Every structure is written in C-alpha cells, then in structure tokens.
Amino acid sequence: PEPDEAPRMVRVFQAAALALGGGSVDEEVRGGGAVPAARQLVLAFAGCCALLSGPRRYRAPTGAKPLAWHLAEAMGKEAAPDLLRVLNAMLILSADHELSPPTFSARIAASVGAELHACVGAALAALSGTGLAGGCDRIEDTLAAVRSRGQLDAWVARVVRDRARSSAFGIESYPQGDPRAALLIRMAREHPRPGLRAGTLLRFVDEVQARVGVPPRIELGLVAACAAWDLPPGAASALWAMGRTAGWIAHTLEQRLNGFFLRPRGQFHAGPQGGAVLKSQAT
C-alpha cells in the first residue's frame, strides 16, 4: 500500500500464516503440538497489527499480557480498561459462526492432513473476499470518503436504492437482526466521545434502518466500534480475522479427531446452452 494507506490485514495474516508454516503435521507434533503453533500464530497476527499505525512495521508482542493488551499496544493505543473491554468483545463475537465458507475451508484442509498454519491460511483466503472481512474494508473506505452531509446522503441513498442488499445490512441467519452487530453498535453509542467517524457511521446506520428496516450486520458493528475508539483503518477486518483464527484452530483440531476426508461431491448436468454445469453437494 501507499505510505498513508492501510494494508489489507487479512492478506497480511494469510502471508504470515504461510510463512510461519510450511511443514507437516509430524513436524508440528515434534515442535510441541498444536498449542505452541496456535500461540505463535495469534501473537504473530497481533504483532502484524502494528502495520496499521505509526511506523507501519511489525512489533513483536512482549510479556505475559492478554491478547487485547498486545493488540492495543500494536495499534499505538494505551491499554485502558474500556478499550480492552471492546477489543475482547470484538474478538469473542468474531470467534465462531456456524460452518461459514472460511471455516469449511479450514476443516477441508485439516481433513486431508494439512498442518495448522496451512489450515488457517486456507480459511483466511476465503475470509478475504468482499462478502466477508473484505466488507469491513469496503465500509471503512466509503466512510473515509464521506466528508460532508451531501456525501452521507448520497451513501444512504445508494444503499436504500439497493434495498440494503450489501455486506453491511441483512443476514439470513438473523431475520430479526444480528445480535453481534447490535451489541457492538450499542458499545459504540455508549462511548462518551465517539468522534466524527463513528458519529457519521451511526447516522448512516440509523437513516438506512429508518428507510428500509433492514438491520446491520457484524461488519458495520465492527467498524462502528473501531471508529468509536479511534482505532486505525483496517482494524475491523484485522480483529474479525483474529477472532476467527481462534475458532479455526478449534475446528482444525476437532476435524483431525474425526479421522475422515471432507470431500464435496459434484455432478455434471446439461446447461441451458448445451454446456455442462457442475452442481456440488458436500458429503
């Protein structure tokens, strides 16, 4: 990225995971097993978050501190209790969410004997899509471009015109609203001095909901909480990926215990123009 541009942290984490790995499950076991490898991954990702602020270089976590504390330090923030509370909330709320595409990717890799770093790397590759953590980056990019009431109105009008069909609003799993997003947005509203970025985003959420009635997704909740605590751009997708990583590690270990391959099956069917269409079904 340019010097003043935030890196896409999911891609940074993916590169870090693959650089730290590269061995086999046997080598992982000889190195002490999955727990040391998991700790190495999570702490490395925390150190990578220093790329979001200050001199934009890796900062190795030091001392026996909670993960949220390491993250605050990496992003150039004082580890105040209120910040640690919201960081922990974002990590916990992001940790697991059914069998999402990234989680399924991690489990498929684990089922065929990939080592831990490779399983997490596979999941991160899926998470980087704009329909998932990439959605946080898109919201932050749009928010950064909103510098007037007219630009905010145009953003609201665009979303309303599309009936809020975006990665920011509406999720089939929660027809009454995503409770993860609701909690994070409430925390953002409760901040005594949320700042301009958060205020603009919260007005955007309120106006879209008033016109369309579609509740926000976790992406908006993460960006709102990060903006309220003045975390640097890119922090929302980074925190989502870090929370998810803990879940993927657990899924990887569980899948290994199952002892069978996850192999989706495919059937070819005649297409409308005479070609073949592959329809897949997980088994």
What is each model feature region?
Residues 1-283:
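Hydrophobic alpha-helical bundle cores within soluble ligand-binding/oligomerization subdomains
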